C-alpha cells in the first residue's frame, strides 16, 4: 500500500513538472541600455518606476491571471488579439511597453531611411509633417493611452490612437513605433507638459529598430 502511495505521489509530481514546463511564464523585458542612459529625455527615476515597477506589475498580474486558462501557454501577441478584460489589459500593457522600451537608444534620433522613409514621405509628404501629425495624435488621446505608427499588410502606414492597453495588432496592423501618454511615463520629468514629452522622444528613437519592424 505504501509503495502504491509513493508511486502515485511520484507520478503526480512528474505531471506537475511537465505541465509547468508547458506554461509560458512571461518575464520583464531586459533593457538594452542603462537606466540613466536616456536622460534627460527619460530620467533614471522614470525608468526605474516605469520599467521596474509598473511593467513588472503587469507581468506578475498576467502570469497569475492566465493560470488554468487557454492563454497559459500562448504568446503575448495572441493573448492581446484574443483576450478581454483583465487578461487583455495586462497583456496589452506588456506588449506595448516591450515595444516602447526596446525602440529607444541613447544614440538614437535623426530620421528613418530606406523603405520606411519612403513610406512616410508617401503618407505625409515629409518626415517633419509626419512628426507633427504623430505628436498631434499623442495630444489627441484623452486620458491615458498610446499613439502608434502602424503598417498594414501592403506596407501602408497610419497613425493610430489607442486607449489604455490598446495595440494596433487588434486591428490587423503591425505596430512599428509608439509613444506612451500615460502620465506615469512622463510626469516625473515633464509634469503636465505632455507636448514637451512627445517632442523630446524623437531624440532617442532608434530608427534601425523601427525599420526592422517595418521590413520584417
Task: Go through each PLM region and give its residues.
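Bacterial Sec-dependent N-terminal signal peptides
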Residues: 1-22
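Feature for soluble, non-membrane regions of globular proteins
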Residues: 21-216
